[in-house]
UniProtKB/Swiss-Prot annotation:
The chain crosses the membrane at residues 7-27. It is a single-pass membrane protein. It is found in: Plastid, Chloroplast thylakoid membrane. May help in the organization of the PsaE and PsaF subunits. Belongs to the PsaJ family. This is Photosystem I reaction center subunit IX. GO terms for biological process: photosynthesis. Keywords: Chloroplast, Membrane, Photosynthesis, Photosystem I, Plastid, Thylakoid, Transmembrane, Transmembrane helix. It comes from the Eukaryota. Its main location: plastid.
Length: 42
C-alpha cells in the first residue's frame, strides 16, 4: 500500500489527474456557457 501511495504522488500521475479534472471542468463550463471560451468578434 505504501508503494501505491508513493506511485500516486509522483509528478506524471499527479499531472495526469490534474489535467483530467481540468478538462472535465472546462467541458462542463463550455456545456453551460457555450460562448464563454470564444473571443467576441466585433
Amino acid at each position: 500500500m505504501q508503494d501505491f501511495q508513493k506511485y500516486l504522488s509522483t509528478a506524471p500521475v499527479l499531472a495526469t489527474i490534474w489535467f483530467i479534472i481540468l478538462a472535465g471542468l472546462l467541458i462542463e463550463i463550455n456545456r453551460f456557457f457555450p460562448d464563454a471560451l470564444l473571443v467576441p468578434m466585433k
